[in-house]
Structures are given as C-alpha cells and as structure tokens.
Amino acid sequence: MQRRFLSSISATAGNTKTLNQGRWSVKQVKKSNFHVTLDEIRTSIDSSDFIALSLQNTGSYAAAWHRVSAIDTPQTSYLKAKYAAERYQILQFALCPFSLQGSKLTVHPYNFHLFPRDELKCGMPSYSFSCQASRLTAMAREGFDFNICIYEGISYLSRAQESASKFLSENPILADSVTVSSSPATVADTVFVGRIRSRVKNWRQSCIDSGSKTGDDDLVSSLRRLVLGSEQYGSRLCLTIDVCSERQVQLILEMLTEFSDDVVPLLVASKSRGTQAVRTVFMSSKEDKDLFKRELKDLEKEENRRVRGFREVVDFISSSQKPVVSQNYLSDFTSIHAKFLGPLPSNVDDFSSSLSSAFPNVVDLSQFMKEISPLSNISNLPAAMSSLNRFFAPVDVEVANQGCPVKLDEGHQSHGQNAVMISQLFAKLCTIQKSDLSTIQSNEDFQALASDEHANSVTSCSKNAGDENVKVWSKNSRRVSSENLVFIWGLGKKMTAAKLKNVLQKSHPVFAREFDVKYIDRSSAILVFWESGPSETFLSAVNNEEQLDGSLREMVAEGLRGAGYETYKRACRLGFWEADLAESLDKALESSDTDPDSDTKPSEIDWSNELAINFDEL
C-alpha cells in the first residue's frame, strides 16, 4: 500500500530543543476555575489543528482475562472495553490541543479533575463506581490528590442524561410545535377538548379584561382570577391544566393553537419523566411573547450549562471536528462514550457508528506507531519515545498556556503531561514518515492527509468488525482461525505451559499434529491447532469420556473440560465477567444463548508467543 505522510515538519540539524517532561506547565482545571477557563479552552481548540487526549480511570480490568489480548476479535475486544468503561470512573481528563508548524510543536495542555457528583439528587451521573486497588496505589505514588478530586472535581452529565434531567428540574419546558395527531378523536376526546376550550376561553377573556381599565376593585379582580383558576408565572398570568396522559397533552396543545397569538403553552414535567400539567401563559403583546420565549431559552441554556459540567469541553471537541489523537483508542473512547454521550451499544458496529457521529476523525496512535516501528509497544509513552531515538526527528515543544504551572515533587508527574507526550510522539512519527517523501508545504495539507490516512480509526474499526480480523504487530506472529482454538480448564495439577503441552502430546493421537499451549489465566489455557480439524476431534473426544483411554481419560475424570471459541464469545456477550475464565466458560456452556445477533462466522486470530500472560504480573 502506498503510504501517505502527514507532516510538514522540517528536520534541520542543530535546531532541536529537548524539554524534560517535568518542565511542561500543564494548566490544572478544577470546579473552582472551570467556568472562567471555558472561553480559553474553546479558543485553544479553535486555534489548533489536532487534539491529543489521555484519560486516567479508577481501573482498567478486574481479572487477567478481562484484558484485551491477541485472541480477541474486534467484538470481544469491544465488549471487554465496554465492561471496563461502564465499571470504572474517569478521574483525570488530560486535553492538549496542538499545532505543527515546521519543527515547532505548539501545545495548549490542560488537565481536568473530574468527579461524578449527584448534584440533581437523581442518581446521575452515577450512584457508584468501581476502583482497582493497584491503580489507586499507582496514582497515589504519582502524587495524585484524592481530596482535590472529591471536593474540587468537575461533575458532568452525558447527553442522554441531560435530556432526562429536563424532566427532573422544576423549570417548565416550552412546548414544541404541534403536529396534528393522525388518530381519530373519540367521544371522550371531544368532550375533554370542549371542556378545556371553554375553560381557556373564559380565563383568556378575564386576562384581557384585567389588562383594560375597569371599575372593578382589586378584591373583585382577585376573586375572578381565583374562580377561573388563574395564577401568576413571574409577572404574567397563567392557567395550569392537569393531565392524566400524553394523549391529553396532545389534545390540549392542538386546541391551544386557536389562541396562539397571546397564549404560550408550557409543559410541567413529572418525576416519572412524563407530563403532569400544561401551563398556559398569557402574553400582553407580540413583543411580550417574543421576549418571554427568549427568557425561557436563556433560562434553559443556563440550566443545561450548569448540569452538563465538563461535557461542555467534550462538546467543544466534537463540534470542532478536529482530528483527535489517542494513545488507546478503544479504552479511551468507550469511556468517553459511556460518560459523556450515552449508554454504550451492544456491538462494535453500532459503537463505531454512534462514535463517528460525534468524533469523525480519530487518530489511533498505537496503529500509527506500528507503521513506523512494528515491534514497539506504545503502552508506555516514555518507552515509545525512546524507541524512536534511532530516527532523526527533531521537534521543538512550546507550551502556549503558561498559566497555573505545576510544581512537581521528585518522582511525581502530572497526568496532564501524558497528553503533551502524545502530541510530541505524534509529531515525531509524522517527521519520520515525512522523511521519505518530498516536503509538504502547508499545514492545511498536513491536516488533510491526517484525516485521510490516520484519522479514520472509527471507520476502520467498523470494517474490521465485519471481517473479525485481529491485527497484532508482534514478533513471530502467526494467523490462526478461531475455529482452531480450544479453551481447556479444570486441570487437576498446576503445571507450566511446556509441561502441559508435553502431557497432552502423550494423551491422544490428535496432538501428533502441530499445536501450541498458552495459559489465559490461572484457571484456563488455550490450545492453538495450526491445522483445521484437530480442534473438533479433540472437543468430541473430551465430551465423550466413554470413548477415551489413557491419560486423557484420567484428565477428563479429574475435571478437564473443553470448549470452542464460540463459548468464549458467548461468555463475553452475555456478560459473564467472573474472576476466573473457567467460571465464565462454565456459565456460558450452561446458558441458552438466544441472541439473534450472535455471529458464528469463524474469525482469524494473530497469535504471538509474546502476548502470553506473565503470571508474575498477576
């Protein structure tokens, strides 16, 4: 494939300035300075060409097998990321809008402290969330201040939660334009509308009369309003009509179009997210009507801004349509979708479609890195930067927003600097790619190429989901169909993978062919058959103990069980996230999967010896 390159950065000898990450000033944004910083953030985003982001969550996985690994298809990878995103909370959101001009990288780093505070007393954004002890320990070691997070963290609502919150606030909602119902009116509808029309007519006439000079004293006027049920909405007269159903709401709104010149209908929401009343407000003139609607919209806008909190920044990023650079696309954007957009869909295709509507251009830095250095691991940013030292890629970093610098203790670092490192790594990768091509002259060309070549992770994820191919760039990688994978568990004795392979070779003729063994966690292992056929033979043998003999019969008698890749996919799809994979596979075998979207198409897996679980890390 012809490679298109992204950068107009010039690589001039002797023009390199190296900045230690501890010297980068990252603006820390908390609840106390959030609103006064919003305009500055919007300006930084608008003036930049790219946006780097990095999240710090309260955890990433609850068990070893919950981590995305080489054996996962895009769908199972997404389900694992979805489970983590719904389980753990974002405590820090590092954002770094940046621009590239020649060898100069201009960054605007911010680090937002978040905490899901239930300010509306309605269980949103979250009643509770999970924490991973090792993650919190690491954050404390880095100097993370949990007191600031809890007391000064910025709260937020997702777009879906904001829509729901309108029904929980006490502010009436301006009724939308009415469309006449297509269903025929019943006798009960006709009687109801006639009664309400008469009531509104009398009330409206009293409002008109009260506006003109009459001989009535204040007492008589008050009694008349009391009899007609007239109330005050601010300085304006209003009438509240209680309703029992949304059908009655529709009928009242249709009827009120007869009085649209001087009557404005408002909906009074109930806590059950329905409508409990329609409030009609009398307008003294057309100018008064226009002013009233503007007041309502301003009030709604201010209320929405108050409850959405940090999501205002997410909306800035989305509306800018700038390419977003992420170190870990799947983990970051499942968390962003769950916390700031709405509930995560059940499959990766719907997720990609939903995400692309908000963030159409996403640069997956891990994939970009593998094009330059296929054997590199980008999970550690300093290590990834070091792996590029063999390339001549000078980048000068200039921090544009110098306000609120962070003084770091020795050994401590601000999470906000991760986003700066991501932008710097991206710039270096662009410089390396560009070195093989003629110089691209303009930054506009740079943006266009970025969008074409590397900023379509959302689309490519959806395409890969259809093919169900896992691409793992690692040494000694071999592609294998998911039909040739077998999960085994219930091993009576603890043994290494090499010893288990040796035992299996002596247990059944099927193991005379080439195969491999890897542990997934402490409870289960996976058999990789490099040819088609042996996996079905082995599973058939394990499930028919009477036909077995020798050591394999003894292993089955001691509790050995086996299942194909479809059982693993079913466990992920049905949410059997037990601590041990063996328990999840047992539940999946016992369950009846009636999911119509379940996919039985075989998948291809890239297998790598380097991606085995290291039990020392568990």
Curated annotation (Swiss-Prot):
Gene3D superfamilies: Ribonuclease H-like superfamily/Ribonuclease H (3.30.420.10). It catalyses: Exonucleolytic cleavage of poly(A) to 5'-AMP. GO terms for cellular component: cytoplasm; nucleus. Its EC number is 3.1.13.4. A divalent metal cation binds at residues 54, 56, 332, 418. Keywords: Cytoplasm, Exonuclease, Hydrolase, Metal-binding, mRNA processing, Nuclease, Nucleus, RNA-binding. GO terms for molecular function: cation binding; metal ion binding; poly(A)-specific ribonuclease activity; RNA binding. GO terms for biological process: mRNA processing; plant organ morphogenesis. It is an enzyme of class 3 (hydrolase). The keyword Ribosomal protein does not apply. Its main location: nucleus. The keyword Magnesium does not apply. It holds the Pfam family CAF1. Its cofactor is a divalent metal cation. Transmembrane segments: none annotated. It is found in: Nucleus; Cytoplasm. Residues 588-607 are annotated as: Disordered. 3'-exoribonuclease that has a preference for poly(A) tails of mRNAs, thereby efficiently degrading poly(A) tails. Exonucleolytic degradation of the poly(A) tail is often the first step in the decay of eukaryotic mRNAs. Belongs to the CAF1 family. This is Poly(A)-specific ribonuclease PARN-like.
